[in-house]
C-alpha cells in the first residue's frame, strides 16, 4: 500500500451530522466517497482506495470540505511512494487533432482546444490551400486571444502514394476472382482499374501481395505485361475510387517529397507553421534536403518524419537522428509489413526517440470506431493507454476529428484515458536517462539532476528558456511533475506544445531575476497551476543565460508566496 494525499479544496456533498462518517456522501464531479462499517473508501475515477484519515473537516451549507485526505492505494506489487495528487494536474501526453469538414469552423476549433487539442494537423492529402489557410488563420486567432494557451500547427504532406483510379460505382471484388491494374489512365471496367503510377509495373513481381485501402482488401500478383498487373483476389470487398495501394514488404520507388509536397511545403513556409510531418521517409537524405531548403528560406519549422514504409526500417537510426521528431504512422506501416510487427516497431521507435531526445507521436486508428459511434471500443482505450505507458509524447486523431460524427467526444476520451493512465504510472525519484546524462554535455547532466530533485521533492519545474532546448531535455527526462516553460519567443512557445509534460508560456524576461520569477509565479497562481505555500524547482540553463551575461547553470527550490 502507498500513501497519497489530496490537496486543499476537496469537496464532498454530505450533511454536517455525517462528518465523522461519510455515509451520506454523494457523487460530486469525479470524486465519490462512501462508507462501510469499519472502513471508509474513496473512488477517484473508478479507482478504489482506502481512506486512512481526514483532516480539517468542516461543514458549510450542508457540504463537507476536506482540506487534506490521507489514503492508501492498492499498489499491485510496487510502491508508489509519498506524493501529492493535484486535481487540476495538467495532462502530460499531448493530443494531435486532424482538422477537416467536421471541425474546420471557428466554433469547433475553439471547442477542440478546450477539450484538449494541443496540435492542429493539416492533412494535405485532402482539401486545398484555401481551406487550410482558413484553419491556420483560426488557430492563430485562438492563440492570439488566449495568451496562456497555445495550439501548434502541423502540416502533413501527402507523400508518394500509389492510388487506384476513379470508378463510376464501387466494384465488388470476390475471393478467387481475377482482377487487373493498368498503368493506362482512365481505365475502369468490372475487372480492371487504372493506377496513377507508371513504374507500378516495375515495382511488383509475381507472388507479391497487393493491399488495397490499408489492407481492407488483398490480391495476389499472378503475372504482368507491359502495362497490366494481373491479380487474384484473396480478401474481397468494395473497391471505390482513389484507394491507396501497397505492396507488402516493399515501398514504391517514388521520391519521398513530390512536386505537390514542395508546393505544400512552400505554403507552410509562407504561413509559418510549426511542424512538417513528412510522409514515407525512406532515408535521412530526404530530411537533410528539406532542412537545407528551410534554412535557405530562414524558416524555423521542425521536421517530423513519418515512419510508414518498409524501406525506412533499416534506416531508423539515421532518419530519426536527422529529424526533429517522429510519427509512428501505423496504417501504411501495417500494410507494408506483417501486422504483428507493428506493436513491436511502435515500442522500438518510441524508445529510440526517447534516447535521442526527439518527440514521438503515435498515430492511426486510435479511436477509429468513434468516427461513427459515440463510444470507443475497449481495445481502442487500451491502445491509447499503451502508447502513454510506452512514453509517447503525443497521440493523434485522424478521421475521428476530420470527418467523424463525434470529434469532441473523441478528444475527451483521449484526454481522460491519457490522464488516467498517467496517474497510474509508477513515480520515480530518478531519471530514466541517467546513464545517457553522464555521457553527454552539461545541459543534459543539469536537466537530469533538476528532474531528480523535482521528483524527490514532488515539485513542479519552472524553466526559463529562449530556445526551448532546456525544456525539451527536461521533458525527455520525464519528471513526475509538470514542466512550466517560460519563453520570450513565440515560435518556441508554439513548438513546445508538442512535448510531453511541458506547459509553454510566453513572457518577456526582465534583467531583474527576482522580478521575472515573481511574474512567472503570479501568472501560475492566477491560473491555479500552483498554490500558495507549495514548493517549486526553478531551473535556468547556462547555455542560454537569461539574467546574467556569462553562462551559469543553477537550480533553486523555492516556496510559492502570493
Curated annotation (Swiss-Prot):
SUPFAM superfamilies the UniProt entry points to: Phosphoenolpyruvate/pyruvate domain, PK beta-barrel domain-like, PK C-terminal domain-like
Molecular-function GO term, any one: ATP binding
Binding site for Mg(2+): 308, 332
Positions contributing to substrate binding: 121, 331-332, 364
Reported cofactor(s): Mg(2+); K(+)
Marked site: Transition state stabilizer: 306
Binding annotation for ATP: 123-126
Keyword Zinc-finger carried by entry: no
EC number: 2.7.1.40
Gene Ontology CC entries for this record: chloroplast stroma; cytoplasm
GO terms (BP aspect): glycolytic process
Pathway linked to the protein: Carbohydrate degradation; glycolysis; pyruvate from D-glyceraldehyde 3-phosphate: step 5/5
InterPro entries assigned: Pyr_Knase, Pyrv/PenolPyrv_kinase-like_dom, Pyrv_kinase-like_dom_sf, Pyrv_Knase-like_insert_dom_sf, Pyrv_Knase_AS, Pyrv_Knase_brl, Pyrv_Knase_C, Pyrv_Knase_C_sf
Tissue distribution: Highest levels in leaves. Also found in stems, roots and flowers.
Reactions this protein catalyses: pyruvate + ATP = phosphoenolpyruvate + ADP + H(+)
Binding site for K(+): 123, 125, 156-157
Pfam families linked: PK, PK_C
Domain of life according to the entry: Eukaryota
EC top class, as a word: transferase
Cellular localization per UniProt: Plastid, Chloroplast
UniProt keywords, alphabetically: ATP-binding, Chloroplast, Glycolysis, Kinase, Magnesium, Metal-binding, Nucleotide-binding, Plastid, Potassium, Pyruvate, Transferase, Transit peptide
Oligomeric and partner information: Homotetramer.
Family membership noted in the UniProt record: Belongs to the pyruvate kinase family.
Protein name: Pyruvate kinase isozyme G, chloroplastic
Organism of provenance: Nicotiana tabacum
Amino acid at each position: 500500500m502507498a500513501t497519497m494525499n489530496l490537496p486543499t479544496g476537496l469537496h464532498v456533498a454530505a450533511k454536517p451530522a455525517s462528518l465523522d462518517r461519510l455515509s451520506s456522501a454523494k457523487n460530486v464531479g469525479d470524486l465519490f466517497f462512501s462508507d462501510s462499517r469499519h472502513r471508509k473508501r474513496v473512488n477517484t475515477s473508478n479507482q478504489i482506495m482506502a481512506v486512512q484519515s481526514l483532516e480539517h473537516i468542516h461543514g458549510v451549507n450542508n457540504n463537507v470540505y476536506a482540506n487534506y485526505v490521507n489514503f492508501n492505494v492498492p499498489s499491485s506489487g510496487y510502491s508508489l511512494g509519498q506524493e501529492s495528487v493535484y486535481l487540476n494536474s495538467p495532462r502530460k501526453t499531448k493530443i494531435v487533432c486532424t482538422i477537416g469538414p467536421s471541425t474546420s469552423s471557428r466554433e469547433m476549433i475553439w471547442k477542440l482546444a478546450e477539450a484538449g487539442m494541443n496540435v492542429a494537423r493539416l492533412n494535405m492529402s485532402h482539401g486545398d490551400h484555401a481551406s487550410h489557410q482558413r484553419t491556420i488563420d483560426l488557430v492563430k486567432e485562438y492563440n492570439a486571444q488566449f495568451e496562456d494557451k497555445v495550439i501548434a500547427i502541423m502540416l502533413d504532406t501527402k507523400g508518394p502514394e500509389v492510388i487506384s483510379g476513379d470508378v463510376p460505382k464501387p466494384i465488388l471484388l470476390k475471393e478467387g476472382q481475377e482482377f487487373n491494374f493498368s498503368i493506362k489512365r482512365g481505365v475502369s471496367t468490372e475487372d480492371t482499374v487504372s493506377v496513377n503510377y507508371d513504374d507500378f509495373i516495375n515495382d511488383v513481381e509475381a507472388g507479391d501481395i497487393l493491399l488495397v485501402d490499408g489492407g481492407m482488401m488483398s490480391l495476389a500478383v499472378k503475372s504482368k505485361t507491359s502495362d497490366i498487373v494481373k491479380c487474384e483476389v484473396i480478401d474481397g470487398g468494395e473497391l471505390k475510387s482513389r484507394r491507396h495501394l501497397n505492396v507488402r514488404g516493399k515501398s514504391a520507388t517514388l521520391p519521398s517529397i513530390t512536386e505537390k509536397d514542395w508546393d505544400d511545403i512552400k505554403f507552410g513556409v509562407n504561413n509559418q507553421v510549426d511542424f512538417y510531418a513528412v510522409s514515407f521517409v525512406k532515408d535521412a537524405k530526404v530530411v537533410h534536403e528539406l532542412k537545407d531548403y528551410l534554412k535557405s528560406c530562414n524558416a524555423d519549422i521542425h521536421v517530423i518524419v513519418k515512419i510508414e514504409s518498409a524501406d525506412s526500417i533499416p534506416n531508423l537510426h539515421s532518419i530519426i537522428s536527422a529529424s526533429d521528431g517522429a510519427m509512428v504512422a501505423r496504417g501504411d506501416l501495417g500494410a507494408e509489413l506483417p501486422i504483428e510487427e507493428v506493436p513491436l516497431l511502435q515500442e522500438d521507435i518510441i524508445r529510440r526517440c526517447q534516447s535521442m531526445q526527439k518527440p514521438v507521436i503515435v498515430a492511426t486508428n486510435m479511436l477509429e470506431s468513434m468516427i461513427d459511434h459515440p463510444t470507443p471500443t475497449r481495445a481502442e482505450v487500451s491502445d491509447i493507454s499503451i502508447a502513454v505507458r510506452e512514453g509517447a509524447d503525443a497521440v493523434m486523431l485522424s478521421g475521428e476529428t476530420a470527418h467523424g460524427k463525434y470529434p469532441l467526444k473523441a478528444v475527451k476520451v483521449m484526454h481522460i484515458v491519457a490522464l488516467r493512465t498517467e496517474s497510474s504510472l509508477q513515480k520515480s525519484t530518478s531519471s530514466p536517462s541517467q546513464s545517457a546524462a553522464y555521457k553527454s554535455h552539461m545541459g543534459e547532466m543539469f536537466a537530469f539532476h533538476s528532474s531528480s530533485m523535482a521528483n524527490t521533492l514532488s515539485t513542479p519545474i519552472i524553466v526559463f528558456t529562449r530556445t526551448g532546448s532546456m525544456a525539451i531535455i527536461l521533458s525527455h527526462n520525464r519528471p513526475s511533475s509538470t514542466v512550466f516553460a517560460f519563453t520570450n519567443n513565440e515560435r518556441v512557445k508554439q513548438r513546445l506544445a508538442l512535448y510531453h509534460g511541458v506547459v509553454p508560456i510566453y513572457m518577456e524576461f526582465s534583467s531583474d531575476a527576482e522580478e521575472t520569477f515573481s511574474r512567472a509565479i503570479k501568472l501560475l497562481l492566477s491560473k491555479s497551476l500552483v498554490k500558495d505555500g507549495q514548493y517549486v524547482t526553478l531551473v535556468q540553463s547556462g547555455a542560454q543565460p537569461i539574467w546574467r551575461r556569462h553562462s551559469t547553470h543553477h537550480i533553486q527550490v523555492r516556496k510559492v508566496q502570493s
